[in-house]
Design a protein with these regions (language model features):
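Generic anion/oxyanion-binding catalytic loop in active/binding sites
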Residues: 91-92, 115, 182-185
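Post-cleavage N-terminal segment of exported redox proteins
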Residues: 3, 11-12, 16-113, 166, ...
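Secretory-pathway/luminal and periplasmic proteins that interact with or process carbohydrate-rich
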Residues: 113-116, 135-139, 206
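Extracytoplasmic electron-transfer domains, predominantly the class I c-type cytochrome c fold
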Residues: 29-37, 97-102, 127-128, 132-201
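Acidic (Asp/Glu) carboxylate-rich active-site/surface patches
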Residues: 8
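Short glycine/proline-enriched turn or capping motifs at secondary-structure junctions
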Residues: 2-3, 187-194, 207-209
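Local sequence-structure signature of Cys/Sec-based thiol-disulfide redox active-site neighborhoods
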Residues: 115-124
Length: 209
């Protein structure tokens, strides 16, 4: 599971100590010292339990930059982030498409990676942010609807590679994206990512019906 994003906590701490108060919809400025202090507090107060290890409170370079720039870095920083993250993507040999039925189960599942879960393959919780099928009774809207993804964009090799890479590490395509870096942070396995790609691409998938 990816390490925790600390910006909401940092923002709350800074907003309580900054005068005058920033507008309600504005993020208080976060500094490197703020990040160090909050990380120190989390390391002090959080404890390893089950599969939830302390590395989850560590920020990597991307998270640090995104926090410092309130998820809206300058163009040169964004380009640097995307290039670095693109280099982390590991494409498997052969086909990038798995089983769409398995992919749908992954997309609908939010289980896994909690301290009290048994270590096993996790779900992707894709429905929390995206519409996946036409008959879903509820879905999130943080991300775009995925209805008709393969029908609209095609399912050729280049689009398969794009979809695999996007699921593997979304920040290779959009710096500071809210989408989890499923492959980079080992939330989903290689086969699971292939299955999600199949969900997006297969003509028989509910995404494309």
């Amino acid at each position: 599971m990816r390490p925790l994003y600390l910006l909401p906590i940092v923002a709350a701490v800074v907003s309580c100590t900054t005068a005058p108060q920033a507008p309600q919809d504005a993020r208080p400025k976060v500094t490197a010292i703020d990040l160090e202090q909050v990380t120190a507090v989390l390391k002090r107060d959080f404890h390893e339990r089950g599969q939830a290890k302390m590395n989850r409170v560590e920020l990597d370079d991307v998270q640090r930059l995104c926090n410092l720039h309130a998820d809206n870095p300058p163009a040169d920083v964004a380009k640097r982030i995307e290039e670095a993250q693109m280099n982390t993507i590991r494409f498997p040999e052969g086909s990038l498409i798995g089983n769409w039925k398995a992919g749908e189960k992954i997309a609908q599942s939010g289980r896994g990676s909690m301290w009290n879960d048994k270590p096993s393959d996790a779900g992707g919780s894709c429905y929390n942010c995206h519409q996946i099928g036409p008959h879903e009774t509820s879905h999130g809207t943080l991300g775009p609807s995925l209805l008709g993804f393969g029908k609209k964009r095609g399912n050729g090799p280049e689009m398969q590679k794009y979809a695999y890479g996007k699921v593997y590490n979304s920040q290779a395509f959009s710096a500071c994206s809210s989408m989890p870096r499923f492959g980079h942070n080992k939330v989903l396995t290689e086969q699971q990512i292939k299955d999600v790609v199949a969900l997006l691409m297969d003509p028989e998938s509910p995404v494309n019906k």
